[in-house]
Amino acid sequence: MKILLAVDGSPCSDAAVEEVARRPWPEGSTIKVLTAYELPMPPTPEAWALPLDYFKDLDVALQKQARNTVDRAIQTLKAKLDKSILLDGVLLPGPPRTLILDEAESWQADLILVGSHGYRAWERLLLGSVSQAVVSHAKCSVEVVRLRD
């Protein structure tokens, strides 16, 4: 079985990691832990006043944070899952919803797991919902894990 676990380092994402870690997956399953990172704002003419290395340094910092997020999830899974489960980590630059869907399709995932931030209507309108986009457009099963109160 191929399981794609999308993480972003948030408490909701941590809940999805814990959900994956507590399940008895079929022997030989592969869990791919994916995180996407992107600049919080596109470079605009106003940004030209910033130092030349600003966006490069920001990209390096975002990559480091993404790597730490993936590594932390993999360590949690390694500690709790059967040794027959294969673990892989990937960090990709770009919008999360697109990258999750593209990776799931190209890898032929059987299941995608994502955490839900539980945004209300106004927040969803402003920020968008990665989990909603994945549920709506994925070609495989999707599980949205909610943070327990």
Describe the residue ranges of each PLM region:
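A short acidic, glycine-rich active-site loop
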Residues: 53-68
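Small/aliphatic-rich secondary-structure junction motif
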Residues: 2-56
